[in-house]
Swiss-Prot record:
It comes from Burkholderia ambifaria (strain ATCC BAA-244 / DSM 16087 / CCUG 44356 / LMG 19182 / AMMD) (Burkholderia cepacia (strain AMMD)). Its main location: membrane. Part of the ABC transporter complex RbsABC involved in ribose import. Responsible for energy coupling to the transport system. SUPFAM superfamilies: P-loop containing nucleoside triphosphate hydrolases. This is Ribose import ATP-binding protein RbsA 1.
Amino acid sequence: MSRSESSRPLLEMRRISKTFPAVRALDNVSLTVYPGEIHSLMGENGAGKSTLMKILSGAYRADAGGEILIDGERIDVDGPLAARDAGVAVIYQELCLAPNLTVAENIYVGRELRRGNRRWGTIDRAAMARGCEDVLARLGAPFGPDTLVGTLSIAEQQLVEIARAVHTRARILVMDEPTTPLSSRETEHLFGLIRQLREEGLAIIYISHRMAEIYELSDRVSVLRDGSYVGTLERESLSAERLVAMMVGRDISGFYKKEHAPYDPGHLLLSVRDIADAERVRGCSLDLHAGEVLGIAGLVGAGRTELARLIFGAEPRTRGDVKLGDRAFGAHSPRDAIDAGLVYLTEDRKRQGLFLDMSVRDNINISVCNRDARLGALDLARGAQRARDAIASLSIRVPNANVNVGALSGGNQQKVLLSRLLETKPRVLILDEPTRGVDIGAKSEIYRIINELARAGVGVIVISSELPEIIGVADRVLVMREGEIAGELGGHTHTPITQEAIIALATGSQAELADAH
């Protein structure tokens, strides 16, 4: 059931503002959503998307002067229970499930069925299991109501959240970056469920940074910028240029444009031969040249991150040789690699890269603080100047260098981590999912930095699951499948770098590769 021009809005958020101490997170924002509509919400990190949805879900109270209407009736969302009773459900990036409880217990949480006395009676688990069988079957769940949630995959746990929303008779479902932890196949299955819910009349508010998802799913797209409403586009009016301009307030032309000179094939920086580990990487070889951006693509589980960590010395290798320039490089630890001029930006910046409870200044300086030591004491002034220079050079949006990194947006956190690596003056830089979880503006700035590094003669390896990104920034692309290099595109092969060619190599579909040419 898609929206018709004559249908009445299901949700109207009018003149919504929210002020925190010294920060106005939302300023007079309005949003209208119809039944049977997938309405995407876009904006850079910090634009106000999450704050607006937390007001809708009852987690925050809006400032005075705004109102929320459902089916034309004004409602007072004074907490999460009020939102649930009004038919609003939210599925956050961090799933809100109890792993030690069953599927049925998670679906009924806060609404448990009891024997006898509804308040004090014992929980009737059998009745709850029976009560959610229909919704699980309706959503095609491959598990039963008595399954422990902790035994399910992330995609299956997400399905439990959707089942809970449907079971509570939610009419408005908010999904915040739901595909971030999913494989391509799991993402397609999720899209099928979202379309099914739309056909059943639910209003879906879909938050994502991924343009391909926005194009594939959206009936309309609304954009926020700096806490204000910018505008709404109908599906037929969508274009990357218009969306990006609305989000960042400026035109980002040549989003993936290669702005560095062709690399020098005679200047080899990194040579890897027959490298392997005990489990995931099975004899991989590659070359990286000065000024080259080398992309590594492949499906989830193909071994891309494992290969990068082997080269970096973060994991032990069972065989293989690595050379930096003309010298053998036997890194036994990341410290060895950094000292030799090879650095690695992890895909998991929060757990493996940043010190979230430390300042921006300390995060930037931590890899090179030994340079500032004088008679055993750190030169704090030099470290502070280095941090200020990095903030200016990488356009890190932060009030000052003393702010904790944990308080920054994803894009600014990524730039802090990248600036730390660049302070080591690397010859080779490995970037693992460098734009994951960052907004459009930050992506553009990261691409600019990659181009600048290549122009300066640094060799850059980019591992990414976003095919347009790989195609746009890389001079050559290696495609991995099941721990091996399945093929090479671009460069001396003269094989065009296309999505079809990458997918064909990643899946082993040689017939599809032939069709691409």
